[in-house]
């Protein structure tokens, strides 16, 4: 079967791979779609360590074609996800308190184990979340990581209906954060970016205000918008240093800043302001299986509509080049 494999020179090679036989608790999935995430770019570039030889992909959707004898949670024909949180231990303090993404023994698809950019994938059956029948599978691929990540981040922000939430970076993650916050949580949205096309897209999605941080002072604009109060919360999907600092600068006292993007640079935080204004900066890592089920359901109810563009597996290196240039709006999804 064909698979997108990380090479030593930080490229991706389309190679033939042979899968082993299933072990107890596993299922074999025929991949239909796999979204391309910025984390895949980090993995390819060895930003988190050298994983030469691994098959990329953690936004996979496909149908079960085989199950091990002991599997009861899945059956042949089920449409399921292959997500970043591939498997956790199920026994530690995190797994037993609804925080399984923080498990110290967690396995991650497309990083520590082979992922979904392949024609077939072996999954741990209990961790393959079923996709609602009403949800388009190509759209579901985007929800599997980008969707659940931003849905969880918006939940972590504690934003309430009618409050102001700022979303920094309106790419594959940011556009979904905007939709979950607006259409599910009932928040008012300010979209921040330096790309006018992405900001126009944010306006189409229902953003109450858009701010090009390159052309104007985002702090001054927010103060005008909120009668000098500041935003109630921000979610940062950008991977650049400047927007993260701006996300702290635009919030009010007692607000929460949620970090989602994974910048390579170290951040500069104004600690005195955090202390004096009681501002919380928290990280939010993808989502649990329950978060993913909820994220899928909201998408199936058309409250969230991922913008996807279908591509071929052979185009994966081109997609990464476009990603590095910042020219992608929405999500690139590989169709198998």
From Swiss-Prot:
Keywords: Metal-binding, NAD, Oxidoreductase, Zinc. PROSITE patterns: ADH_ZINC. CDD domains: CAD3 (cd08297). Binds 2 Zn(2+) ions per subunit. Its EC number is 1.1.1.1. InterPro entries: ADH-like_C, ADH-like_N, ADH_Zn_CS, D-isomer_DH_CS1, GroES-like_sf, NAD(P)-bd_dom_sf, PKS_ER. Zn(2+) 2 binds at residues 89, 92, 95, 103. Zn(2+) 1 binds at residues 37, 58, 145. It catalyses: a primary alcohol + NAD(+) = an aldehyde + NADH + H(+); a secondary alcohol + NAD(+) = a ketone + NADH + H(+). Its cofactor is Zn(2+). GO terms for molecular function: alcohol dehydrogenase (NAD+) activity; zinc ion binding. Signal peptide: none annotated. It holds the Pfam family ADH_zinc_N. Belongs to the zinc-containing alcohol dehydrogenase family. This is Alcohol dehydrogenase. It comes from Staphylococcus aureus (strain N315).
